[in-house]
């Protein structure tokens, strides 16, 4: 899986990100990309093709990628999140009474930028996407968990990089460049892991589907992707797998939706239009509905 949009219209990877200038620590930039490694290199002038004009400001290069939000089901969803993060004073995804940034030009501190990120993750439109926040810097992690505006919620999935960087060892050019190289390496490892995890899951699912007829664990309907592939007029049934590597659960996607929706109704008293998560009927681990749907779309393409 590369960084292109799949035939089902689902990106293999897409994230929004927060950059911070290494020499000017109070300068930030918010953007989005299907390939954070390539984009970070563009921002730092290592790649001339691809723009990144706004990060060419005098004295701000090189930049480090401080935080990312990934798991978007489409490029459009990522661009909506990016725009809302950039314009917190007017976005419809934050209620007027909840706004931390109330006017254009405000919200420049790291506390405010991360607080806006949390507010966006609270909105139902983004909440059902089960987005993942990844933090690459020790001081960014401290700000996140300090939670100055008291906006933390247990449903926000946060990944803390084990090798997160501390502050640059000095202000000289050599120290700044070394810090930038280490940050780029962290982003490379993160991006590679993300693609590999999805690729390995999809490879295993395709292998199982190539065996032919499979029975839904819920309605017992027979699904045969091999047979459907031979028929130009037949649309493939959307299917669901458990992504626990030791679980062999398989069902129609619609059947699992009914299970997740019913379980969420029991927990909350409300029938969800889109469930956020649910337990695998076979192994009982918590599964992200958005992730299951994303895999299902790739498999049916």
UniProtKB/Swiss-Prot annotation:
Please verify whether the record's keywords include Plastid. Answer: no
Cleaved signal peptide residues:
none
List the SUPFAM superfamilies: GIY-YIG endonuclease
The coenzyme or cofactor needed here is: a divalent metal cation
Q: Name one GO biological process term.
A: DNA-templated DNA replication
Where it mainly occurs, coarsely classed, is nucleus
Q: Where in the cell is it found?
A: Nucleus
Single GO term (MF): crossover junction DNA endonuclease activity
| Residue ranges covered by zinc fingers (SLX1-type) | 216-283
The residue ranges of the GIY-YIG domain are 12-95
Q: What is its EC number?
A: 3.1.-.-
- The answer to keyword Cell cycle applying to this record is no
Broad enzyme group:
hydrolase
What UniProt keywords apply to this chain's record, in alphabetical order?
A: DNA damage, DNA recombination, DNA repair, Endonuclease, Hydrolase, Metal-binding, Nuclease, Nucleus, Zinc, Zinc-finger
Entry's InterPro entries?
GIY-YIG_endonuc, GIY-YIG_endonuc_sf, Slx1, SLX1_C, SLX1_endonuclease, Znf_RING/FYVE/PHD
One GO cellular component term: Slx1-Slx4 complex
Question: Organism's domain of life?
Answer: Eukaryota
Q: Report the HAMAP family cross-referenced here.
A: Endonuc_su_Slx1
Q: What does this protein do?
A: Catalytic subunit of the SLX1-SLX4 structure-specific endonuclease that resolves DNA secondary structures generated during DNA repair and recombination. Has endonuclease activity towards branched DNA substrates, introducing single-strand cuts in duplex DNA close to junctions with ss-DNA.
Tell me how this protein assembles. Answer: Forms a heterodimer with SLX4.
Q: Identify its protein family.
A: Belongs to the SLX1 family.
What's this protein's name? Structure-specific endonuclease subunit SLX1
The species this protein was found in: Eremothecium gossypii (strain ATCC 10895 / CBS 109.51 / FGSC 9923 / NRRL Y-1056) (Yeast)
């Amino acid at each position: 899986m590369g960084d292109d949009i799949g035939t089902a219209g689902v990106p293999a990877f897409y994230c929004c990100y927060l950059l911070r200038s290494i020499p000017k620590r109070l300068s930030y930039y918010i953007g989005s990309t299907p390939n954070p490694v390539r984009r970070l290199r563009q921002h730092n002038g290592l790649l001339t093709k691809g723009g990144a004009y706004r990060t060419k400001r005098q004295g701000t290069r090189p930049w480090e990628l401080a935080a990312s939000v990934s798991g978007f089901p489409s490029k459009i969803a990522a661009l909506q999140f990016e725009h809302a993060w950039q314009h917190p004073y007017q976005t419809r995804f934050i209620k007027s009474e909840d706004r931390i940034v109330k006017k254009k030009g405000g919200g420049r501190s790291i506390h405010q930028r991360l607080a806006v990120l949390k507010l966006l993750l609270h909105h139902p439109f983004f909440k059902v996407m089960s987005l993942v926040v990844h933090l690459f810097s020790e001081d960014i992690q401290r700000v996140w968990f300090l939670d100055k505006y008291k906006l933390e919620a247990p449903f926000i999935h946060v990944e803390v990089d084990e090798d997160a960087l501390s502050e640059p060892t000095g202000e000289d050019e050599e120290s700044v460049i070394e810090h930038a190289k280490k940050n780029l390496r962290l982003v490379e490892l993160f991006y590679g892991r993300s693609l590999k995890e999805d690729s390995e899951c999809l490879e295993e699912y395709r292998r199982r589907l190539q065996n032919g007829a499979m029975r839904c664990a819920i309605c017992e309907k027979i699904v045969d992707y091999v047979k459907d592939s031979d028929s130009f007029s037949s649309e493939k049934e959307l299917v669901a797998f458990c992504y626990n590597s030791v679980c062999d659960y398989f069902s129609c996607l619609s059947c699992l939706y009914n299970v997740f929706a019913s379980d969420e109704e029991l927990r909350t008293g409300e029938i969800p239009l889109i469930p956020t998560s649910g337990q695998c009927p076979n192994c009982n681990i918590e599964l992200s509905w958005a992730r299951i749907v994303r895999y299902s779309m790739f498999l049916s393409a």
